[in-house]
Regions:
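Bacterial signal peptide processing site
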Residues: 23-26
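C-terminal motif of bacterial Sec signal peptides marking the signal peptidase cleavage site
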Residues: 18-21
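Bacterial N-terminal signal peptides that target proteins for export
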Residues: 1-9
């Protein structure tokens, strides 16, 4: 990993030089039709706010709804000695299936998705989650506030781990909470990335989270035959993936190697892209919660059985800018993505193996 980080720092320096000397000015960049800000694919829900829902991912949480149809899944260890939580992101309220078990909100996820005007859905939240929502005047749909008006549980309502919701249920409470499911001009964070024109009536759009394209030439991969992936968040938390050549996707596994299934349809969750980003983290004032540096870092991108070592930094046209191992700007293949933030503070690590079991990192 030390060699990886040395390479990452070198790549970042190279990319900075390239950006300084070769970046196109805004006036020279060709205008493009907006795409789905989560997948880079055709925009099916124009003018709508994406919806982000935190769900429980503890080892005992064997029933999870909505995984297989989320456009984007985020994962990070946000507190020591606790399980990771997943954040399932959908392109609009109308695209949300039954989702759960809904868990406490995490400000880390809202920070990552602020450029997309995300609508947060949660079951309560800690001090830092609430501080973030209050500071930016964001309103979440919170199960502790609206209860059975938007959340359900097949058993006793006190059975917290099984609370779930859906797009139809959420729609029923947005009006009373004064929450709009549509993008609003006042919250578009980068006006140069917005297609809104109040005079022409054009629908608003927001920047993509990741640089993506449907078609295009990719740089040579740093490794091929990347068949098995394991993200070890800490001693108790890990997520695995196995590559399926027929579907050209990475299929999600629990820490014990069992399939991570969507309770809505019994399907194993899979992704076109795996993006594992390394980020410096620090303990917050409570001595438990982790804060992540979202300015720059190294990482790995996996797609169709290939691996690229990358560096990342904040973007303007997209939330993240990515660079390959030669310091050149990198555009991912459009599709569903899993994005993990991995910290060095908790001994987290990434293992990628080929079909013979050889480590590729």
């Amino acid at each position: 990993m030390k060699r990886f980080w040395m390479r990452a720092l070198l790549c970042f320096a190279l990319s900075a030089a390239l950006l300084t000397g070769c970046a196109l000015s805004p006036s020279s960049q060709p205008a493009e039709s907006p795409t789905d800000p989560l997948t880079g694919q055709e925009l099916v829900w124009p003018g709508q706010r994406p919806v982000a829902i935190t769900i429980d991912n503890a080892a005992a949480s064997t029933t999870q709804w909505g995984l297989s149809t989320a456009s984007l899944v985020l994962e990070a260890l946000t507190a020591q000695q606790q399980a990771t939580r997943l954040c399932l992101v959908y392109p609009a309220v109308g695209a949300v299936p039954q989702v759960g078990p809904v868990s406490a909100g995490q400000d880390l996820y809202w920070r990552l998705l602020v450029g997309q005007q995300v609508l947060p859905v949660q079951r309560g939240g800690g001090q830092f989650d609430q501080n973030y929502l209050d500071y930016y005047s964001l309103r979440a749909v919170d199960a502790l506030e609206v209860g059975t008006n938007a959340f359900s549980c097949e058993t006793d309502w006190q059975n917290v781990p099984l609370w779930h919701t859906s797009g139809a249920a959420l729609s029923g409470v947005l009006g009373s909470l004064n929450i709009s499911p549509a993008l609003t001009e006042s919250r578009v964070t980068d006006t140069s990335s917005s297609s809104s024109d109040s005079e022409s009536g054009t629908l608003l759009s927001v920047p993509n989270l990741l640089p993506m394209q449907e078609n295009g030439k990719l740089p040579d991969a740093d490794a091929s035959d990347a068949m098995s992936v394991r993200v070890q968040f800490d001693a108790q938390n890990a997520t695995g993936f196995s590559y399926d050549a027929d579907s050209k996707t990475y299929r999600m596994l629990h820490a014990d190697g069992t399939l991570q299934l969507d309770a809505n349809n019994g399907q194993q969750t899979d992704f076109d892209n795996l993006l594992i980003l390394f980020s410096a983290s620090t303990l917050r004032d409570d001595g438990v919660t982790l804060d992540y540096d979202l300015t720059m870092g190294g990482g790995v991108w996996l797609n169709e059985g290939h691996l690229w070592n990358i560096t990342w930094t904040q973007g303007s046209e997209t939330t993240f800018f990515l660079y390959d191992s030669n310091g050149r700007p990198l555009t991912l293949t459009a599709g569903r993505s899993y994005l993990a933030l991995v910290s060095s503070l908790t001994g987290q690590e990434l293992t990628v193996q080929n079909s013979t079991g050889e480590n590729l990192l």
